Amino acid sequence: MTHEFTESYDVIVIGAGHAGVEASLATSRMGCKTLLATINLDMLAFMPCNPSIGGSAKGIVVREIDALGGEMGKNIDKTYIQMKMLNTGKGPAVRALRAQADKSLYAREMKHTVEKQANLTLRQTMIDDILVEDGRVVGVLTATGQKFAAKAVVVTTGTALRGEIILGELKYSSGPNNSLASVTLADNLKKLGLEIGRFKTGTPPRVKASSINYDQTEIQPGDDKPNHFSFMSKDADYLKDQIPCWLTYTNQTSHDIINQNLYRAPMFSGIVKGVGPRYCPSIEDKIVRFADKERHQLFLEPEGRDTEEVYVQGLSTSLPEDVQKDLIHSIKGLEKAEMMRTGYAIEYDIVLPHQLRATLETKLISGLFTAGQTNGTSGYEEAAGQGLIAGINAALKVQGKPELILKRSDAYIGVMIDDLVTKGTLEPYRLLTSRAEYRLILRHDNADMRLTEIGRDIGLVDDERWKAFEIKKNQFDNELKRLNSIKLKPIKETNDRVQDLGFKPLTDAMTAKEFMRRPEIDYATAVSFVGPAAEDLDAKIIELLETEIKYEGYIRKALDQVAKMKRMEEKRIPTNIDWDAIDSIATEARQKFKKINPETIGQASRISGVNPADISILMIYLEGNGKAHRKY
């Protein structure tokens, strides 16, 4: 079929949420002429649910996005109202940053960034169809009948695909926050042959700040110690005038109100069909599933400096409006609270992610990429991370360059994508530190050391960032080398000082680095014995040194595991493999291999239901069958 295109682009990104913004900024910064199409320009990078960025695992993803040259970290550092480091009492592998955002300012700042970006056109329009010829993307069709040519298309539609809002017995077609749903595109994605799933998520009510009795709640302040999501942010710019959050709880009266109205709850009445998030359940679901709990935490989170709206985290619900009011008024501190917005549930279509490659390109259609909630994830950070990788690979494909695949040992983003494309997901997927087997090397503090060189190679890390990174890396390497070269001897003068500090004396000579491996010896103590570095070191470099030195043994073990897995990842599986021709593999493994079509032995080994014997048989088969080949 011959199309008459009115405009032509290298890449078209459909949807301007957190995934779409990162995808379009990446492609345009890599030199591709890009169109970012959105149903509503006023909702670019909008936060329809929680007014926050980061958190456990998610905060590390934001650091990874920043290290690669993405935008989310820089944008939240410009627009937060509170910053807090989580899990400080635990090991470095699980520490992560979380920020309360001024949600309106966050969206405005991101829109300014997009509007100023070269090679990027921003357009309010609805895309109804993906145009495909001979298994390849050639463009898109708008609702007004315009056809735009494209060499690659990235679908980042969030919860808009056949979206339906549910509130009590009310159910109507809508995207998030009463925006337009994208119904025709949902139909056409299915017609293209993609398998579609149906998920559900929800949001809590918002209450008016001036109607809250804060005396009945517990204050939750931000941190005084400076922390940032972006490696380019300066401590001098750290916000001093932070806005606190507040903690309260449900109670038996709250639970009684919910239990008495379960018959009106869409989750239990049969109105909701989609699968909801396991790790962010509605309050009615929590009351039923955890009936033995006397109370549940609720955090009152301001949505910005210039609004009275307060987000009641932990109270996600689709109960009828009158029940929501009664529920709010049963809670300590909210007895007279004014509900400004009701909570609601939203159902939406997703593209089942086992149909994707690790580049986030669909296996079915060349040049078609999907990212974010479209792939079945939950959360702004997961969406942004996928959007960045999809955008990078769309640009690389257009330019005829090698693709970028982040491995599980490279980044949490790599863990997430591998989980999605290898295991799929039966519910909205959320990143957790427990999903990462190499989490000690995927830390908050070393994201730039892991990923900035990759960002530079693909063209997303500019000269200013690269220079700052090189300075930091050289300072780190030089100081590590110095600490490993200076020796402390068990002489009387040294041991007297060690004992004066309350520590065990030295029995053998050791390097300053070995001295620092003692749990009680921090960097400041070590340099008091061996002298300071040649130049003043930033606190973040010192933190990195302490972690790398104190956990060196564990880190080395993790790197050994990575090396073993790398050998399996390098063993490719051909696309034209005949799974039925492989004798002796288990029926379940054969079925999973056919469905997932793994690209490497490593990926095949991570598919649920596949055992080591199946992998051994597969490897023997591949060694004896050299004719097959994989190509995209």
Curated annotation (Swiss-Prot):
GO molecular-function term, one example from the UniProt record: flavin adenine dinucleotide binding
Main location per the UniProt record: cytoplasm
GO cellular component term, pick one: cytosol
Residue numbers binding FAD: G15, A16, G17, H18, A19, G20, I127, S182, Q373
GO biological process: tRNA methylation; tRNA wobble uridine modification
The protein's required cofactors: FAD
Binding site for NAD(+): 276-290
Alphabetical UniProt keywords: Cytoplasm, FAD, Flavoprotein, NAD, tRNA processing
Location in the cell: Cytoplasm
Transmembrane regions: none
Family assignment from sequence similarity: Belongs to the MnmG family.
Subunit architecture: Homodimer. Heterotetramer of two MnmE and two MnmG subunits.
Function: NAD-binding protein involved in the addition of a carboxymethylaminomethyl (cmnm) group at the wobble position (U34) of certain tRNAs, forming tRNA-cmnm(5)s(2)U34.
Classification via HAMAP family: MnmG_GidA
Protein name: tRNA uridine 5-carboxymethylaminomethyl modification enzyme MnmG
Organism: Streptococcus pyogenes serotype M1
This protein's encoding gene: mnmG
